[in-house]
């Protein structure tokens, strides 16, 4: 029953979503956004680090999933996004969490079935998949979609392992070991 923290990084708004996976069932635990003001970038990064650390302390996740960097048209924006991602990853690694990265297109494909889905489609599907009473804000929905993508990746890994007669239970350590094995075969990017 791993708890997965998903992060949608941004230098001004960083979305987060926390779910618990029990087999194929996903349970919503919480979501929201870390908002930074128009302060200088170092202060914003400090707030992102503190916010992610607070979320980790509150929910005690077992795994950390984050969106990969994409090539932006504006180099300055891409650099700031990369710094925000790096800050969130450092917070996770400082809490000994394994870090998994997913491309935005894969996240959208996993949640909506369409790799080019817009934010509203992602919000709608996240709301349905987690049986939420109301739509989460856009950044939180994206973070939940990242966590859902990681949960689906775990489920797929377990199915493949069982089909190849590997003995894998539902123990968190066994799941993590399986995910690392998949990474070593070049199917994932894993840090930590």
From Swiss-Prot:
Active site (record annotation): 8, 67, 139
EC number: 3.1.21.10
Keyword match Ribosomal protein: no
Cellular compartments per GO CC: cytoplasm; Holliday junction resolvase complex
Localization annotation: Cytoplasm
CDD domains, per the entry: RuvC
Comment on bound cofactor: Binds 2 Mg(2+) ion per subunit.
GO MF terms held by the record: crossover junction DNA endonuclease activity; DNA binding; magnesium ion binding
SUPFAM superfamilies assigned to the protein according to its UniProt record, in alphabetical order: Ribonuclease H-like
Binding site for Mg(2+) 2: 67
Keywords tagged on the record: Cytoplasm, DNA damage, DNA recombination, DNA repair, DNA-binding, Endonuclease, Hydrolase, Magnesium, Metal-binding, Nuclease
GO terms classed as biological process: DNA recombination; DNA repair
Catalytic activity field: Endonucleolytic cleavage at a junction such as a reciprocal single-stranded crossover between two homologous DNA duplexes (Holliday junction)
Source taxon at top rank: Bacteria
NCBIfam families (UniProt xref): ruvC
Known role: The RuvA-RuvB-RuvC complex processes Holliday junction (HJ) DNA during genetic recombination and DNA repair. Endonuclease that resolves HJ intermediates. Cleaves cruciform DNA by making single-stranded nicks across the HJ at symmetrical positions within the homologous arms, yielding a 5'-phosphate and a 3'-hydroxyl group; requires a central core of homology in the junction. The consensus cleavage sequence is 5'-(A/T)TT(C/G)-3'. Cleavage occurs on the 3'-side of the TT dinucleotide at the point of strand exchange.
Family the entry assigns: Belongs to the RuvC family.
Name of this protein: Crossover junction endodeoxyribonuclease RuvC
Native organism: Actinobacillus pleuropneumoniae serotype 5b (strain L20)
Biological classification of the source: Bacteria, Pseudomonadati, Pseudomonadota, Gammaproteobacteria, Pasteurellales
Gene: ruvC
């Amino acid at each position: 029953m791993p708890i997965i923290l998903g992060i949608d990084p941004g230098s001004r708004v960083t979305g987060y979503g926390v779910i618990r996976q029990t087999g194929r069932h996903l349970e919503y635990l919480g979501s929201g956004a870390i908002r930074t003001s128009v302060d200088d970038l170092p202060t914003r990064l400090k707030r992102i680090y503190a916010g992610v650390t607070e979320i980790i302390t509150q929910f005690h996740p077992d795994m950390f999933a984050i969106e990969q960097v994409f090539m932006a048209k504006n180099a300055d924006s891409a650099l700031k996004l990369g710094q925000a991602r790096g800050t969130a990853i450092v917070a996770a690694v400082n809490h000994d969490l394994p870090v998994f990265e997913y491309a935005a297109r894969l996240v959208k494909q996993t949640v909506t079935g369409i790799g080019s889905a817009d934010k509203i489609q992602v919000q709608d599907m996240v709301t349905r998949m987690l049986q939420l009473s109301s739509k989460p804000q856009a950044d939180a929905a994206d973070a939940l979609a990242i966590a859902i993508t990681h949960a689906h990746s775990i489920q797929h890994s377990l199915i493949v392992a069982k089909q190849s007669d590997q003995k894998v239970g539902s123990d968190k350590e066994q799941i993590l070991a399986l995910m690392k094995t998949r990474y070593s075969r070049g199917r994932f990017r894993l840090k930590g």
